[in-house]
């Protein structure tokens, strides 16, 4: 679920979100909230407060589009993120520029040492997939594997996927 800066700065976010979760019998551990680096700059203290409370309830946080915003590593490491989603622009630039590729290698190493799960977005072909695996990403996302699906199509999509695996 994508979160905006105004949602994350809402003093009532925890209570409102937990009411929705509880009324729909959803386990908080199944919820993933995505936010971009820029979403953290409205009211940083309130954003961190909300993230910590939600994280304690079991909700996980993904930092989306890493590498395209302000990339303040001190703030990122000080926030309760579980997963860092590297933006596709880093992937594309890495394949054409060895300096960018080296930076991605170092970043993945540092984030892994800190216990983050790493995901890369925008993988569209085998070269990009191989590169992402070689760099140590835990998850790969992109059109090579699946295109975004309307909710109404998800059951059919997963049924086909299950048949293909069986």
Where do the protein language model's features map onto the residues?
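EAL-family c-di-GMP phosphodiesterase catalytic domain
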Residues: 4-11, 30-44, 57-166
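A short, hydrophobic coiled-coil helix within the histidine kinase transmitter core
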Residues: 16-20
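Short helix-capping segments at alpha-helix termini
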Residues: 23-28, 54-57
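Conserved functional hotspot residues or short segments at active or partner-binding sites
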Residues: 50
